[in-house]
Amino acid sequence: MYRKILLTLALTVGFAATALAQEVTIGLTMGTTGPGASLGIHYRNAFQLMPKTIGGYPVKFIMLEDKTDATEAAKNGRELITQDKVDAFMGSVAVPSTTQLAQIANELKTPLMALSPVALPPDKLDWTFVVPQSTTLMMSAVVDDMKKKGVKTVGYIGFSDSWGDLVLKAVEEKAEPAGIKIVTNERYARADTSVTGQVLKVIAADPDAVVVGGSGTGGALPHIGLVERGYRKQIYHNHGTVNREFIKVGGKSVEGAIAPTGPLIVPEELPVDNPVKKVALDFTTRYEQTFGPGSRNAFAGYSYDGFLLLDAAVPIAAKTAKPGTPEFRQALRDALENVKNVIGTHGVYNMTPKDHNGLDERARVLVRVDDGEWKLLK
């Protein structure tokens, strides 16, 4: 059994002057193994860079491994809430896992910072706050680029799970009004090692462009297959593929791939007046100092932005309740629902009771693989 790793960032020695202060406990369930490992490792790494306090209170992180498995993630979520009595929890690396966590957040009335872009009805997100950009927001940038380039038909190949469904739905929603017809809907499992059959069907349809609805290294598989079989038109991805591992696996085959992502991938290329530039540049600099040049990625930024949202909400909640109590969890949820102008690495968050994501078009850019690096598409 995978047992918890305690990340007690607020050590007693460091807080002698605040010994009487209540400690805030944040639970984490991450898939650093399994098919989502190339994402989960980055989600986890971000916690080495977190401040030692949250909203002025000592903070303790309790991390559990879920192996990119929805059932395991659900079990971890329950354990963190019922046994560890966390004040809030964060996770996980895949939409199926995070969907399970959202249900548990509602049931056990504990705020969840969703690290995958789940798309559920508002009543299902009552206790969930979605950190990543919505799939619709991101894929609309892709459709805009296709329209600009005169694309009339597009092939789709994506995961055979809720993430693949989300990406397809977002493309469908924007493509039809733009006069773009989706001519294939091919699927593959996250753990598949070959997509030859699906790729051949896409090539047979001869679309003007292809959208891949995968994530992480799994998103490279159909791209490689398409290029190997002679497809030379534009291949688009989604914000689940923008990391170094995707390029390592894809090599020269993924040169020219276009994907939407958050500004933190290219902070140096952002205008000086971009509100996200300073925070994104600071985080990517510290991340690469710790984990090596070129290690920047969107997923560590989601963890950090989740922390920043909690950091803004904790002092508000603490005015009416003490950490470690049901009353504090309720107050924290209510505070999160109303945070304004929280500048993260991905965008500026403005939550409302009807919008538990709070991001706008400032939270997206298009990037392209150019000489083995993700660079801003200009």
Report residues per predicted region:
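N-terminal signal peptide c-region/cleavage motif recognized by signal peptidases
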Residues: 14-18
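Extracytosolic ligand-binding ectodomains
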Residues: 2-11, 21-378
